[in-house]
Amino acid sequence: PHALLIVISLAAALLAGAIWGFLPAFFKAKWNTNETLFTLMMNYIAMQLASYFIIVWEVPKGAGKIGIINQDTRAGWLPEVGNAYLLPILIVGLMTVLMYVYLQYSKHGYEIAVVGESQRTASYAGIKVDRVIIRTMVLSGALCAMMGFIMTAGIDHTLTTTIVNSRGFTAVMVSWMSKFNPFIMIASSLLLVTMDRGASEVASTLSLNHSFADILTGIILFFIIATEFFITYKVTLRKSSRKEA
């Protein structure tokens, strides 16, 4: 049945994402590895795995890509509510609310905040740091997989190595700019999308290279990040007070 296929696809995506998130979490908890570098390296593994299965499932053979999946029957497709984007937006909105409640009002959210500030303090407070790290990254992996499921089952209905493009790196920027507040992330995301579309329009109007949009957006983000230094720290200029011998 159509509904059952959606449930199975979602469950498989969440399980795969949770396992993918568990790997760097285990190494972080066990040997204190750098989770940022670890996950960046795993990105290349994920891309090659995707490339492999694209060749295995390519349609037609030799095309090097997968066509629209179940285009005739639409089996496994998320139902359209108004248009292809409305239901994914509603799902993301619901997830945003749930994540805010989880981070702000649950015991797990409190533990994440304490461990993020200082693992040593968390240990003194009786929090099992290793368990928090693994649980948090497994949940993060599952949420990322949820986004991948929405992209494939709700919007693109196909699989490519560039289906998410650079959204993962953009998500890191959005999270940092939003101070990890789920609601502010929505505003930050809209800002980045507006900047990207505006820069693309400028590049198109002036007949510039397609990379110009990324360069312009990067420059703007650079200055936004630079201002964080002056927000966090107070710069004071002092005259040298050396005494003559």
Annotate the PLM regions.
Residues 61-65, 109-114, 233-245:
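Short, Lys/Arg-enriched, Gly/Pro-containing loop segments at transmembrane-helix junctions
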Residues 81-158, 182-183:
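Helix-loop-helix "hairpin" substructures at the membrane interface of multi-pass membrane proteins
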Residues 13, 138-144, 148-218:
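Transmembrane alpha-helical segments in multi-pass inner-membrane proteins
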Residues 35-105, 212, 244:
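Transmembrane helix-bundle core of multi-pass membrane transporters
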Residues 97, 124, 128-131, 199-245:
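Cytosolic-side transmembrane-helix boundaries in multi-pass membrane proteins
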Residues 28-30, 103, 177:
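Helix-capping/transition residues at the boundaries of transmembrane alpha-helices
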Residues 13-19, 43-51, 88-101, 140-147, ...:
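Hydrophobic core segments of alpha-helical transmembrane domains in multi-pass membrane transport
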